[in-house]
From Swiss-Prot:
Plays an important role in the de novo pathway of purine nucleotide biosynthesis. Catalyzes the first committed step in the biosynthesis of AMP from IMP. Mg(2+) binds at D13, G40. GTP binds at residues 12-18, 40-42, 304, 330-332, 412-414. Its EC number is 6.3.4.4. It catalyses: IMP + L-aspartate + GTP = N(6)-(1,2-dicarboxyethyl)-AMP + GDP + phosphate + 2 H(+). IMP binds at D13, E14, G15, K16, N38, A39, G40, H41, T128, R142, Q223, T238, R302. Homodimer. Keywords: Cytoplasm, GTP-binding, Ligase, Magnesium, Metal-binding, Nucleotide-binding, Purine biosynthesis. This is Adenylosuccinate synthetase.
Length: 427
């Protein structure tokens, strides 16, 4: 099996969906391995814009399988809404497969997410309140309900009653709140499971069959390395592992199956939610990037925080995800800026450091050390090779590659599929 993993190298929203869609044309199977509908992928082609949250980007290719792996947490009601929306626009979803071992998000997870954020007050994480974190907590506590359980009426009924009893005690003690009732959950979610029944299967077997048949598999990451619960800006992170290594756990394939890891980044940096952000901008350059780049969350609609490109972050992501190739998106967004900056290191308590601190208080004290490069004014949205880019834009990309220690295999100069340029064959 030849396989490629696509991961975000920043705090998510790097354009992974577009790159996955671009690479999916040559793949046989496209599989998601982590996260839930807190993720948001925007894909544009043929003059149409599609916003996905749970459905893998490969859904648009009828002859390829789009897999939701066991490491994904699935809100069945939200998933059906997404599938219905695609069907209404003439997109077939018959090629979708959902792991029977994927955990199910239920209304009490959404309630718990809301209550937890309220309890934290000024120390809130800034979650999307989609129930992702509480679902992963239940998984770790071994009380989670999986897709296989949802499909069996007696199993689902028994497990749901047990969990509601537990959640009621927990909600009362922690938040002075009550859990959604059995009657408020059971019928709707069991019916949702029955509608999804034909999609649910042992997806690890599908991927193993692809391996035996020497097919091409594309693994689609969600969020980004800096949101990884182990390697990100903890505790301002997601509740799963977006790093490439989680492909093995989140889909059931062996670690020797991975051939390449494509690290996706923007030509600048953005993040949604709270937490340290060393290169964050609050000036006119930041306003330019946010408005030209349309930096508003796909899932939440919230304005994203934006900042200059941070090579400290990228080097960290390269190391913990084993990144072999770099895909740089949204280069066109920087057009028109007199000067563009790259963070090369941090200053911490008067000392220069080049590695990302694990301690949050230290990270908050870090000041970015910038290298300034001249900007460009030329329209680059039609450029199809590095040689076609203005010299200043080309120098900017080459400097990023040099600082991060990874060569560039893909660059993008606009939101459409046709504006994504491959510099070398990856399969």
């Amino acid at each position: 099996m030849s396989s490629i993993v696509v991961v975000g190298t920043q705090w998510g929203d790097e354009g992974k969906g577009k790159i996955t869609d671009f690479l999916a044309e040559q793949a046989d199977v496209i599989a998601r391995f982590s996260g839930g509908n807190n993720a948001g992928h925007t894909i544009q082609f043929g003059g149409e814009t599609y916003k996905l949250h749970l459905v893998p980007s490969g859904i648009f290719y009828k002859d390829k399988l789009a897999v939701i792996g066991n490491g994904v947490v699935v809100d069945p009601v939200a998933l059906l809404k997404e599938l219905d929306g695609l069907n209404e626009r003439g997109i077939s979803t018959d090629n979708l497969r959902i792991s029977n071992r994927a955990q199910v998000i239920l209304p009490y997870h959404l309630a718990q997410d809301e209550y937890e954020e309220r309890r934290r007050g000024d120390n809130k994480i800034g979650t999307t309140k989609k129930g992702i974190g509480p679902a992963y907590v239940d998984k770790a506590q071994r009380i989670g309900i999986r897709m296989a359980d949802l499909l069996e009426k007696e199993t689902f009924e028994r497990r749901l009653k047990e969990n509601i009893e537990y959640k009621n005690a927990y909600f009362k003690g922690m938040f002075n709140e009550t859990c959604p009732t059995f009657d408020e959950i059971f019928d709707e979610y069991y019916a949702a499971g029955q509608r999804l029944k034909d999609y649910v299967t042992d997806t690890a077997k599908i991927l193993d069959d692809a391996n035996v048949a020497d097919e091409k598999v594309l693994f689609e990451g969600a969020q980004g390395v800096m949101l990884d619960i182990d390697h990100g800006t903890y505790p301002f992170v997601t509740s799963s592992n977006p790093v490439a290594g989680n492909v093995t756990v989140g889909t059931g394939v062996g670690p020797t199956s991975v051939s390449k890891v494509i690290g996706v980044c923007k030509s600048y940096t953005s993040r949604v939610g709270d937490g340290p952000f060393p290169t964050e901008l609050f000036d006119e350059d930041g306003h330019h990037i946010r408005e030209v780049g349309r930096e508003y969350g796909t899932t939440t609609g919230r304005p994203r925080r934006v900042g200059w490109f941070d090579s400290v972050v990228l080097r960290h992501s390269r190391r913990v995800s084993g990144i072999t190739d770099l895909s740089i998106n949204s280069i066109d967004v920087l057009t028109g800026l007199d000067t563009v900056k790259i963070c090369t290191a941090y200053e911490l308590d008067g000392e220069k450091i080049t590695e990302y601190p694990a301690n949050l208080d230290q990270l908050r004290r870090c000041k970015p050390i910038f290298e300034e490069l001249p900007g460009w004014t030329e329209d680059i949205t039609g450029c199809r090779s590095l040689d076609e880019l203005p010299e200043n834009a080309r120098n900017y990309l080459e400097r990023i590659s040099e600082l991060c220690g990874v060569h560039i295999s893909i660059f993008s100069v606009g939101p459409d599929r046709e504006q994504t340029n491959l510099l070398e064959q990856l399969w």
